[in-house]
């Protein structure tokens, strides 16, 4: 049976494990209508447009 030759230190284990749980950055695009930041392929919550089409009215 395979056995490790030396014990892996706690810092090496945590360093390796940290890459699994690394948070990734969320991609952000700009709304072509109002210029506000929004998630890609989603309706802009600031103005209610998806691309050039008005999807819903925004109550202000």
UniProtKB/Swiss-Prot annotation:
The GO molecular function terms of this record are: structural constituent of ribosome
**Keywords, A to Z?**
Ribonucleoprotein, Ribosomal protein
Q: Which GO terms describe its cellular component?
A: large ribosomal subunit
Entry keyword annotation includes rRNA processing: no
The cross-references to SUPFAM superfamilies, in alphabetical order and at most eight, read: Zn-binding ribosomal proteins (SSF57829)
Q: Which domain of life is it from?
A: Bacteria
The reply on keyword Transcription regulation is no
The name this protein goes by in its record: Large ribosomal subunit protein bL32
The record's section on InterPro entries has:
Ribosomal_bL32, Ribosomal_bL32_bact, Ribosomal_zn-bd
Its GO biological process terms?
translation
What family does this chain come from, according to its entry? Belongs to the bacterial ribosomal protein bL32 family.
Q: Which residues form a coiled coil?
A: none
NCBIfam families found in the cross-reference section: rpmF_bact
Quote the gene name from the UniProt entry.
Answer: rpmF
